[in-house]
From Swiss-Prot:
SUPFAM superfamilies, A to Z: Ribonuclease H-like
Cofactor binding: number and manner: Manganese or magnesium. Binds 1 divalent metal ion per monomer in the absence of substrate. May bind a second metal ion after substrate binding.
EC number(s) from the headed UniProt entry: 3.1.26.4
Location within or outside the cell: Cytoplasm
The protein's name in its UniProt record: Ribonuclease HII
Positions annotated to bind a divalent metal cation: D29, E30, D121
The organism of origin for this protein: Polaromonas naphthalenivorans (strain CJ2)
Length: 208
């Protein structure tokens, strides 16, 4: 992994150990379904039961500083982590739900260790060749899903920071691509950039 805080988006990023073990369970979650810009990011995490991580919770309930610290700790202590994304182009061609499922599928397939079961936050499942279960509010109930939610959220927030430097007029570093009043005003003033989701109504309106 890059040592600096900001990351360029990649299809898959992972940290692993080189040994396998039966009975492995992976938690999966996503970040970025709602924003008007940027990829949707998914993460899959297999935690080490002998190396626990304290303070795991739904990423939305944590401060940005706490998420950053847990991101590094998860990368260091988990047996295996994988982060993947679906691009803006894929979101526009597939729709956001199918793009989210694709990102989750890529995250699971990016794990070096093959889990016996996958627990996914929410009520939908990606198409997998592994036993999987959807857990509503799983990011608050299952530590591995909490860890995945933190990885996905931090990775995507860093992506927004990178693209803020490229397109400062939109304020991506602040609103993370969501449809805030500031973001909508910038869209009306500057039009859409290549990272805006053209299939989303507020973006489509300025392209007419």
């Amino acid at each position: 992994m890059q040592s600096r805080k900001s990351l360029k988006p990649e299809k898959t990023v992972q940290t692993v150990f080189s040994w396998d073990s039966p009975g492995l369970m992976a938690g999966v979650d996503e970040a970025g379904r709602g924003p008007l810009a940027g990829p949707v990011v998914a993460a899959a995490v297999i935690l080490d039961p002998f190396n626990p991580i304290m303070g795991l919770a739904d990423s939305k309930k944590l401060t940005a500083l706490r998420r950053e610290k847990l991101y590094d700790e998860i990368q260091a202590k988990a047996l295996c982590c994988s982060i993947a994304l679906a691009t803006v182009e894929e979101i526009d061609s597939l729709n956001i739900l199918q793009a989210t499922m694709l990102a989750m599928k890529r995250a699971v397939e990016g794990l070096r260790l093959k889990p016996n079961k996958v627990l996914v936050d929410g009520n939908r499942l990606p198409t997998l060749k592994i036993l999987a279960e959807a857990i509503v509010k799983g990011d608050a109930l299952v530590p591995a899903i909490s860890a995945a939610s933190i990885l996905a959220k931090v990775y995507r927030d860093r992506w927004c920071g990178d693209y803020h430097l490229q397109y400062p007029q939109y304020g991506f570093a602040g609103h993370k691509g969501y449809g805030t009043a500031e973001h909508l005003a910038a869209l009306r003033q500057h039009g859409a950039c290549p990272q805006h989701r053209k299939s989303f109504a507020p973006v489509a309106q300025v392209l007419r």
